[in-house]
Design a protein with these regions (language model features):
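Short gly/ser/thr-rich secondary-structure transition/capping motifs
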Residues: 1-8, 37, 366-372, 450-456, ...
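Flexible, Lys/Arg-rich cytosolic regulatory linkers and terminal tails that connect or flank
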Residues: 343-364, 488, 559, 628-631, ...
Length: 647
């Protein structure tokens, strides 16, 4: 990985390697807009982890005509500047450079006390939404000055450079996009005019801070919305890049997507690396200044390949460094398997959309770096602990306890560790989960955990260890309803199908449409089955993040399954099932050669009760505690094991 670890330059600024922490809203600011302990600890850990340049998430530049999200940090006035100095000092301790992104929501802002959100035109963010205030030329100059003033504050706070947030549907992008910009003055029409607000801000910053103060511009290379009229495509990207370079930008940071397609910049798991490489290449070939680019990079080998192909000069690592802040240090040692590689589950984005601080399914410490120690207290003193179950919660518990100095034995009834993740990675496009399983296996081994596979232990076998405590992580069992015919041989669970233990064909009645049910439906449709999806609720995927559901349904719907909503299974018989509309009471017979149950799981309460009656100190984590997902499993396994058997 020679190229990844070769120093690079942005203007006169030397960067120790080619990895950049991409700017991502984390919601780690203080309530008043200050940078506080939470943000400082988060960014310091990424600097400690070896990245060359950190671009701190977008900070607000306008408190009058822009309403930021909850917990967004701000450089909109001088009162905030001092709060960022500890942040830049913390980053610089590790020979890491830092920029800060300057941000304005534009039409995406909620109305402020001053009135409607300011934007390029009155076009609302989404059809039917509130219209924005079309800025006058005088108002554009006011906002430009607010960006420039924020850059001055950034320099005073110790930042090495700044970046303009000119992508992802925010104010500057609203000027660039013909969909939002219907102006006929000098700020609309041609690419040069649509970029005028960008170029005047860049030139204004240079005039105030000098030509050697680096300015990055993040812009949209392709909005990837062919169904929306008048949007930017890759054909526009080279011309956009050349205008920005001519204006004095020191580096460009190309991203993609807009308000109609955020998946183009924060992709679900179904997207592969290099899917948008053609955009990056088009920009790179058009400019002579350095280029930062995302490439759905979750693996250092992909980062190296991106650089080797000449697609960019610096690779932007976003969710990869949320999942594992030590990505670069591990890569430098060649420890690729030791990196917790983002699986694209979108839990981080799900939190953000709910206006909550970002969390990560794979990294339970993210956002809590100042609370949970990187190295836990060594208080195990060789005491014995048994962990029952080798899924994500069990493995995380075992590793955490071993790091505390406990003597840990992990029991797993299957022949390999991983638990339900070994099924989750079998669904279409879910191969990335296997990477996490392999990393967790490596962590278990490196922590010195004793692993016993292939048999569920008896109580006596566990007692023979004389454990001081037991961690129950035995998972959950599929729910099977008590209805006539459920025990017939053509009835199975979604787990049976996904694992490959049962092959189905012909007409299939799928009962339930949670995430597992939808993945099973996609698998069966891909194999040519005629699938009838039967769901008691009014929509499929209820309770799951809409982005993931929409991504899966975009592949399921074209295969034309039959869908029955607010419909309950009442009986199974040979060749058919009986269902009832829960709203009207109407009964219906649906032909089915196979019936696949996907009704969720229930904790193994009987196993838990047995262990609690046999041992004094028992904690329960993961699905064994409550039905959950990978983020719940890793968080419970980590946090509960940090405090288990404390004096």
């Amino acid at each position: 990985m020679d190229k990844l670890f070769t120093p690079g330059k942005i203007g006169k600024l030397t960067i120790k390697n080619r990895a950049v922490l991409a700017p991502m809203q984390m919601m780690y600011g203080e309530h008043q807009g200050y940078a506080g302990e939470k943000a400082i600890a988060y960014y310091e850990e990424r600097a400690r982890g070896g990245v060359g340049l950190i671009i701190v998430e977008g900070v607000n530049v306008d408190e009058v005509n822009n309403k930021p999200w909850n917990l967004q940090m701000s450089l909109a006035s001088d009162k905030y500047t001092a709060s960022f100095q500890p942040l830049t000092e913390a980053i610089h301790k590790y020979d890491c450079r830092c920029f800060v992104q300057l941000h304005h929501y534009g039409a995406k802002s909620a109305p402020t006390a001053a009135g409607k959100a300011w934007a390029a035109s009155e076009v609302p963010v989404a059809p039917g939404g509130p219209s924005a205030h079309k800025m006058t030329v005088e108002e554009i100059k006011i906002v430009e000055q607010r960006f420039i003033d924020a850059a001055v504050r950034a320099q005073k706070a110790g930042f090495d450079g700044v970046e303009l947030a000119g992508s992802h549907g925010y104010l500057l992008h609203q000027f660039l996009s013909p969909y939002y910009n219907d102006r006929t003055d000098e700020y609309g029409g041609s690419i040069e005019n649509c970029l005028r607000i960008y170029t005047e801000i860049v030139q204004g910053i240079k005039a105030r801070l000098g030509k050697d103060f680096p300015v990055s511009v993040r812009f949209c290379g392709d909005e990837f919305t062919p169904h929306i009229p008048k949007t930017r495509t890759v054909e526009d990207a080279p011309a956009i890049a050349r205008v920005l370079e001519a204006a004095g930008a020191d580096v460009l940071n190309v991203s993609n997507g807009n308000n109609f397609n955020a998946n183009a910049n924060c992709e679900p798991y179904s997207y592969d690396s290099f899917w948008k490489a053609h955009v990056t290449r088009a920009v790179k070939e058009a400019i002579s200044i350095p280029l930062i680019a995302t490439n759905t990079i979750k693996d250092p080998l992909v980062a190296e390949e991106t650089l080797e192909k000449g697609l960019c000069d610096f690779v932007a690592l976003g969710r990869a460094l949320i999942a594992d802040p030590f990505f670069m240090k591990k890569a430098a040692k060649g420890d690729v398997v030791g990196i917790r590689k983002c699986i694209g589950c979108m839990y981080c984005r799900e939190q953000l959309y709910a206006q909550l601080p970002v969390k990560c399914a794979l990294n339970p410490r993210v956002g809590y770096e100042s609370v949970y120690p990187l190295v836990p207290e060594q208080d195990g003193a060789g005491r014995v602990v048994a962990v029952i179950g080798g899924g994500p919660a069990g493995m995380q518990s075992a590793v955490t306890l071993a790091k505390r100095g406990f003597d840990v034995t992990l029991f797993e009834k299957e022949d390999t560790l991983g638990g339900t993740m070994n099924l989750a990675d079998k669904g279409p496009h879910k191969e990335k989960i296997a990477r996490f399983v392999e990393t967790m296996k490596a962590e278990v081994e490196r922590a010195g955990v004793k692993v016993l596979l292939g048999k569920a232990p008896s109580i006596d076998e566990v007692k023979a260890l004389a454990p001081e405590g037991v961690v129950m992580a035995a998972g959950a069992a599929p729910i099977v309803p008590r209805i006539p015919g459920v025990d017939k041989p053509h009835v199975c669970t979604a787990y049976d199908v996904i694992s490959g233990d049962v092959k189905v064909s012909g007409k299939v009645a799928l009962i339930g449409s949670g995430i597992t049910g939808l993945e099973c439906a996609e698998m069966m449709l891909n194999e040519g089955c005629q699938v009838a999806m039967i769901e008691m609720l009014d929509a499929v995927g209820t309770g799951m993040f809409s982005v993931i559901i929409n991504d899966i349904m975009s592949r399921i719907k074209p295969k034309d399954p039959t869908m029955y909503l607010h419909t309950m299974l009442t009986e199974i018989d040979d060749g058919y099932v009986m269902v009832k509309d829960v709203k009207t009471g109407e009964e219906k017979r649906i032909e089915a050669d196979h019936v696949v149950l996907s009704l969720g799981v229930a904790p193994r309460a009987d196993v838990l009760a047995e262990y609690r009656s046999a041992f004094k100190n028992v904690i329960c984590v993961g699905d064994n505690a409550q039905r959950g997902r990978i983020p719940h499993a890793t968080k419970e396994g980590y946090i509960k094991s940090l405090v288990f058997l404390k004096d």
